[in-house]
């Protein structure tokens, strides 16, 4: 008796028992969600050389201990305008702020950077126990920790400071960092000891290469390199993106400024914007917004005409001929529309300008790239999940006609879902999927034809005047 798998709508010629795994497969096969951007920042607080996942203001407050309005987080704010999740990587750590809070007792910021200078330690006598003291830590005048102790050695570290030394907290010491300091002043209910000496450290090229090395093991859709200078560093960045895309099959895009990458994986930002609060977002800083917007865009969404939230002008207003010329060079531009005072993306393109039979001008459009990348990433994910599922049940995908049919069914279901969502068109499983056994008969050779749906960006009207 014959057996195997079957596809709904296709009758078998032979009698037999056939199993259709369609229901289970449909539960697994899905379109992946986009929205994650990897972003290096030179912030003034937080753990350095590690990624922190930020999806909300609450995440930022809890995981980093900073307000979203902190001046050092401009790039994060711009990226988060469109990205769902920002994998924030603090590039460097400067000197840690500190202060003596009693004779022989010191409080030291847990992280280096100028933000540590905004920490204040206040020591008050406990209202219920005259022999105890309330030691309160403040960041930006907001209470972040409070401990009641009798001796300094009882103090424990919190998320903002560590305490070292032993001594009597009622000692008389100078109040460092506060206005009106005197050589000696008794700690009282209004005393505030401000930490000082915290400094930032400017990142260098090696800090950015450390960022790229760390990012290689993370999962993201788009990654930004927000640097103004350094062609060698940008070339390293482009090589990193090419290695991920072409060597490892991880279809991501990279965004940098003023670098003609001539590659569909690199977006070249060459213009900046002016925010409503007067902040100038230069092209290198604008990479954060472009990366966030590109990550947040779905596979069937173009950024062409998308407005830059909070922008009131561009840094350089370009005439028509200049815009056309620079688009031809693969530059990502912003345009100011004087009619409604808005700033928007001129055209959602990447840096690819050399077209071939294998990569025509369609590959210069980021929307098309997002569709093709979705096919690659989603099918890779689904096949891995399928292999894992079969391994978990004590079997493998058979290198046989049955396994071939099962893989084709999974691909068909995914492509149909993608077409229903408007990402592709004209898909025909009979014509567009060809699967055969490889020469060693331990795998499959799969040919897949895909027709991505482009965005309507040009509208032509023939107007007849009667």
Curated annotation (Swiss-Prot):
The record ties this protein, via Gene3D superfamilies, to: 2.60.40.4290, 3.30.1370.220, 3.30.1490.360, 3.30.360.90, 3.40.50.11790
Top-level division of the source organism's lineage: Bacteria
Q: Where are the transmembrane segments?
A: none
Pfam families referenced in this protein's UniProt entry, alphabetically? Gp18_domIII_N (PF22671), Phage_sheath_1 (PF04984), Phage_sheath_1C (PF17482), Phage_sheath_domII (PF17481)
**Hey, which family's this protein in?**
Belongs to the myoviridae tail sheath protein family.
The identity of this protein, by name, is Phage-like element PBSX protein XkdK
Query: What organism does the record attribute this protein to?
Result: Bacillus subtilis (strain 168)
């Amino acid at each position: 008796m014959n057996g195997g798998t079957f596809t709904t709508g296709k009758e078998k010629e032979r009698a037999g028992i056939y199993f259709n795994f369609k229901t289970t497969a449909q539960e697994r096969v899905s379109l992946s969600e986009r929205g994650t951007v990897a972003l290096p920042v030179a912030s003034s607080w937080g753990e350095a050389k590690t990624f922190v996942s930020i999806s909300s203001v609450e995440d930022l407050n809890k995981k980093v201990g900073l307000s979203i309005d902190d001046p050092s987080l401009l790039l994060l704010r711009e990226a988060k305008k469109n990205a769902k999740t920002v994998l924030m990587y603090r590039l460097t750590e400067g000197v840690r702020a500190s202060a003596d809070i009693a004779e022989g007792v010191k409080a030291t910021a847990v992280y280096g950077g100028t933000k540590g200078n905004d920490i204040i330690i206040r020591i008050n006598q406990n209202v219920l126990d005259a022999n105890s003291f309330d030691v309160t830590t403040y960041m930006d005048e907001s209470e972040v920790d409070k401990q009641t102790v009798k001796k300094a050695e009882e103090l424990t570290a919190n998320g903002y400071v560590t305490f070292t030394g032993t001594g009597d907290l009622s000692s008389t010491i100078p109040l460092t960092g506060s206005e009106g300091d005197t050589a000696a002043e008794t700690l009282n209910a209004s005393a505030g000891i401000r930490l000082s000496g915290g400094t930032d450290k400017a990142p260098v090229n090696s800090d950015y290469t450390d960022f790229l090395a760390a990012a290689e093991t993370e999962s993201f859709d788009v990654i930004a390199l927000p640097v103004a200078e350094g062609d060698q560093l940008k070339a390293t960045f482009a090589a990193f993106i090419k290695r991920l895309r072409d060597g490892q099959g991880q279809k991501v895009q990279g965004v940098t400024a003023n670098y003609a990458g001539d590659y569909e994986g690199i977006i070249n930002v060459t213009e900046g914007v002016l925010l409503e609060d007067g902040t100038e977002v230069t092209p290198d800083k604008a990479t954060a917004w472009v990366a966030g917007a590109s990550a947040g865009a779905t596979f069937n969404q173009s950024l062409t005409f998308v407005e830059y939230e909070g922008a009131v002008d561009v840094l350089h207003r370009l005439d028509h001929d200049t815009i056309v010329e620079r688009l031809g060079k693969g530059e990502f531009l912003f345009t100011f529309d004087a009619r409604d005072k808005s700033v928007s993306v001129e055209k959602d393109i990447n840096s690819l300008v050399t077209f071939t039979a294998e990569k025509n001008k369609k590959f210069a459009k980021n929307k098309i790239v997002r569709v093709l990348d979705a096919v690659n990433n989603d099918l890779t994910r689904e096949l891995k999940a399928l292999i894992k599922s079969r391994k978990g049940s004590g079997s493998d995908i058979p290198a046989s006609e049955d396994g071939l049919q099962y893989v084709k069914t999974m691909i068909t279901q995914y492509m149909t879902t993608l077409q229903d969502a408007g990402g592709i068109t004209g898909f025909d499983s009979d014509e567009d999927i060809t699967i055969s056994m490889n020469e060693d008969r331990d795998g499959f050779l799969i040919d897949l034809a895909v027709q991505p749906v482009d965005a309507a960006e040009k509208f032509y009207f023939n107007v007849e005047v009667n």
